[in-house]
Design a protein with these regions (language model features):
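Conserved P-loop NTPase "ATPase switch" module shared by AAA+ and STAND
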Residues: 124-149
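Sensor-1/coupling segment of RecA-like P-loop NTPase cores
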Residues: 59, 143-145, 156-180, 190
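The conserved phosphate-sensing helix
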Residues: 230-244
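A short, basic N-terminal segment
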Residues: 1-53, 259-261
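Walker A/P-loop nucleotide-binding motif
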Residues: 49-70
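Conserved small helical "lid"/interfacial subdomain of P-loop NTPases
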Residues: 192-222
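Conserved catalytic segments around the Walker B and adjacent sensor/switch elements
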Residues: 55, 78-94
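Conserved NTP-binding/hydrolysis module of P-loop NTPases
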Residues: 17, 96-115
């Protein structure tokens, strides 16, 4: 465990390898992940075909899907055709029931609650009908209930594409096979690869700079960082865990050396 005192003594202002809770702290030099954002933004502002209001983005485990989903949902997307599109992020591992899905949308929009799913849907549709804003649903994982999402996207087709959905999935063979009727709305399918070894190494270095260290390579061994990036096998999650363990080891070794010198 690295204490705040340890970090300050090592010339950091914060832990460089903890997960960012704010999606604005996004490393922009991961080519595939940057492309995901560009493609998704294009989908969000495209109102040409009202039938196509569902996008699927598929990537390998640990490739940054959650951060990308949160970043897209956190953004406010001005649209010349329909005002502003606001995003709602949902992790479908925690949204376990259909009513939780609808309740999440109602709560995020600040609408009155209801005990009926039908009333919840009607409340959402009435709000969007009377509002200049659009709604972007960003699902981190497969949809919990396809029926309600299908109903929302069907309504959107007849109402100037006011509801759009982006779904982030693990990149598997025939990812959308189980989407059933939702495939009729599919207007975007974009698979992306994991970051390269060099990209991960650059990310780890940049995180140290963002955490306040004036010269990360004076503390971290460059080859060790490249080895961590290589052993992560494309997983950003694994790379951050291993880098954190490496930093803790370095700090402990430095503390022991200082203790011996002070005797």
């Amino acid at each position: 465990m690295i204490s705040t005192t340890d970090l300050v003594n090592a010339k950091f202002l914060e832990h460089p390898f903890l997960r960012y809770t704010d999606p604005r702290f996004f490393f922009p030099h991961l080519a595939e992940q940057r492309k995901v954002l560009e493609v998704a933004y294009g989908f969000i502002i495209d109102n040409n075909d009202p039938q196509k209001n569902l996008g699927v983005l598929a990537g390998p485990i640990g490739s940054g899907k959650t951060m990308l989903a949160m970043k897209l949902a956190a953004g406010v997307h001005p649209n010349l055709d329909q005002g502003v599109t606001h995003g709602i992020y949902m992790n479908t591992n925690t949204v376990t029931e259909p009513r939780h899905f609808l309740m999440g949308v109602v709560d995020a929009l600040g609408l009155p609650s209801s005990r009926s799913n039908a009333n919840r849907l009607e409340t959402i549709f009435d709000f969007l009908s009377d509002s200049p804003q659009g709604l972007l649903l960003v699902l981190d994982g497969p949809p919990v209930n396809q029926d309600y999402l299908h109903e929302m996207l069907s309504w959107s087709v007849e109402n100037k594409k006011r509801i759009k959905a982006l779904v982030f999935l693990q990149d598997l063979y025939e990812t959308t096979t189980n989407f059933g009727g939702l495939n009729a709305f599919l207007g975007l399918y974009h698979p992306f690869r994991a970051p390269s070894i060099q990209e991960i190494a650059n990310l780890l270095y940049s995180r140290c700079k963002l955490a306040g260290h004036p010269d990360p390579l004076s503390l971290l061994d460059e080859q060790a960082i490249l080895n961590i990036a290589s052993e992560a096998h494309g997983s950003l999650t694994t790379a951050l865990i291993q880098a954190s363990q490496y930093l803790e080891q370095l700090i402990e070794e430095k503390k022991k050396r200082l203790t011996i010198m002070n005797i």
